Amino acid sequence: MRSFEFFEHTADVGIRAYGKSLEEAFSNAALGVFEIITDTSKVKPIEYREIYLNGYDLENLLYKWIEELLYYYDSELMVFSKFDLMIDQDSMTLEGKAWGEKFNGKIHERRTVVKAMTYHQLSIEKTENCYLITFVVDI
């Protein structure tokens, strides 16, 4: 199973992320966002940021997850390539670590800046075999 793919969207970028678990799908959604920013295969998981979030539903939790990661990119130039997280659907909380390193222009390719997560076309579906997350980011 592929981890994520991009789809056409006027002036923005759409992402479809897949995972056998909800946590894997959220991780792959984040990986897709950072793949827009740089080549994540060159991002070493050297340091991490702990993340604790709560939401009112899964879509809101995903929105906050991506926004939190983009906050670290905007404020610290952190780019991420590995994610360890747990999602509790009863309390609608996410707890985890995002692993990566500070962006270094000598190592990391500068691609497109992701400005923000959006609610446009945001959906989280559970199929028989996997979770599918669809969303659009503003570039």
Swiss-Prot record:
BP terms from Gene Ontology: tRNA splicing, via endonucleolytic cleavage and ligation
Keyword tRNA processing: yes
One matching Pfam family: Archease
InterPro entries: Archease (IPR002804), Archease_arc (IPR022952), Archease_dom (IPR023572), Archease_dom_sf (IPR036820)
Binding-site positions, Ca(2+): D12, D138, I139
Protein function: Activates the tRNA-splicing ligase complex by facilitating the enzymatic turnover of catalytic subunit RtcB. Acts by promoting the guanylylation of RtcB, a key intermediate step in tRNA ligation. Can also alter the NTP specificity of RtcB such that ATP, dGTP or ITP is used efficiently.
Family: Belongs to the archease family.
Matches recorded under PANTHER family: ARCHEASE, PROTEIN ARCHEASE
Protein name: Protein archease
Native source species: Saccharolobus islandicus (strain Y.G.57.14 / Yellowstone #1)
